[in-house]
Amino acid sequence: MTDLTSLTLAEARDGLAKKSFTALQLTDAHLAAIEAARVLNAYVLETPEQARAMAKAADERIARGAAGPLEGLPLGIKDLFATQGVRTTACSKILGEFSPPYESTVSAQLWRDGAVLLGKLNNDEFAMGSSNETSCFGPVVNPWRREGSDAKLVPGGSSGGSASAVAAGLCLGATATDTGGSIRQPAAFTGTVGIKPTYGRCSRWGIVAFASSLDQAGPIARTVRDAAILLRSMAGHDPKDTTSVDRAVPDYEAAIGRSVKGMKIGIPKEYRIDGMPAEIEALWKQGADWLKAAGAELVEVSLPHTKYALPAYYIVAPAEASSNLARYDGVRYGARVNGRNIVEMYENTRAAGFGAEVKRRIMIGTYVLSAGYYDAYYLRAQKVRTLIKRDFEECFAKGVSAILTPATPSAAFGIGEKGGADPVEMYLNDIFTVTVNMAGLPGIAVPAGKDAQGLPLGLQLIGRPFDEDTLFSLGEVIEQAAGRFTPTKWWA
């Protein structure tokens, strides 16, 4: 039998429908792969008993012809999504052994459609990071290595566990979240596909909040088709989330293979940053050539406020985080460190519970929201955000269907290599991705090539609001031209 963990999600779905194997066999193969790959530290909690029970129930539904769209397909869930009765910590000490009494809307919809829970995936603490090194469970290791080197590389962040697990064959797909690039950057670093949908497309209910006006859930998968299949189940209106948009969810898979002839693709001149590596520039041109060969028209566009996006993002996001994280005080749930009085208990709990990067962002956020600096920083950043959104609106109003950019300024870097002395060095990883969150737009990262050391590189496509279909059609053109990217297994 084929190695079941090497199948795409679509292939596994079709194999189950043909009864080539059972959901239990598929799940057991993934559980064995997870056990053999613990060195990657992708999972922070494995749920084998629950997975097998869900797989058996899926096999019964398949047998009686009542299969859902994801019936029997084993997935990993980022540890930011509440899973009822299954420990959810946001990879922070402050949540301790917290076991949610409810299920996040996104994961509930996956289970409704028949998916199987393999376990909870590692992420940067409270999703704050670009390398998955801030998790209280330790860093995630990228399954990719530089040619001729055994140095451990980061998988990107904050959804590093999701990206690493998908790339290494430890699940058929995974949930992830994206606040400033946390789906697209890890996807680019691991040779996987990641889509951040339009803000409001997927419910945020039951997802641990980082920055509420920027956070959005989405899938990481091995192929564009797989991402389309997963997003259809994850998306949809939810009355429990006031920012959820009540729009019908299209059949995203139907966009795969659709012609892109005549589409206008914007190439933004502002994304040609100083010091951009030649191989990223060459990859960008290659991607544009592939889309042109498929019948798309390339046009240069201007997004003049791009240069202000990163500083504005690192004001807005920490400001919202400082407010959201005020709820973690040790009183009603999570870890508690006692003190002589309640104020001391708050202080002790937060001092011991939060990691260094989370504390840094809470401090930045509290500072920019303080009376003396609110107008100078926070208010100004929100005005910049409006201008960034307007840049995109003007671009799309000229008939541009999507915008093509690099996904990251480099390939994956080594664990411990960046951001030690200067956090800004790490923040610069988000330079191509934050504009999408600031404007609330959909963006997809698709693997498009390798660097000189054999590491995957990704391209990003940015779409009009709620036009994820077009991103899937264009993304598949790049995927077909570039081919699939699979790391050489060194860990088992």
Curated annotation (Swiss-Prot):
Catalytic activity from the UniProt record: L-glutamyl-tRNA(Gln) + L-glutamine + ATP + H2O = L-glutaminyl-tRNA(Gln) + L-glutamate + ADP + phosphate + H(+)
Catalytic residues as annotated in Swiss-Prot or TrEMBL: K78, S158, S182
Gene Ontology terms describing biological process: translation
SUPFAM superfamilies for the chain: Amidase signature (AS) enzymes (SSF75304)
Keywords: ATP-binding, Ligase, Nucleotide-binding, Protein biosynthesis
The enzyme's E.C. designation: 6.3.5.7
Domain of life (superkingdom): Bacteria
Gene Ontology annotations for the cellular component aspect, listed alphabetically: glutamyl-tRNA(Gln) amidotransferase complex
Alphabetical list of PROSITE patterns matching this protein: AMIDASES
A single MF term (Gene Ontology): glutaminyl-tRNA synthase (glutamine-hydrolyzing) activity
HAMAP family for the chain: GatA (MF_00120)
Subunit structure: Heterotrimer of A, B and C subunits.
Function of the protein: Allows the formation of correctly charged Gln-tRNA(Gln) through the transamidation of misacylated Glu-tRNA(Gln) in organisms which lack glutaminyl-tRNA synthetase. The reaction takes place in the presence of glutamine and ATP through an activated gamma-phospho-Glu-tRNA(Gln).
Family: Belongs to the amidase family. GatA subfamily.
Name of the molecule in the record: Glutamyl-tRNA(Gln) amidotransferase subunit A
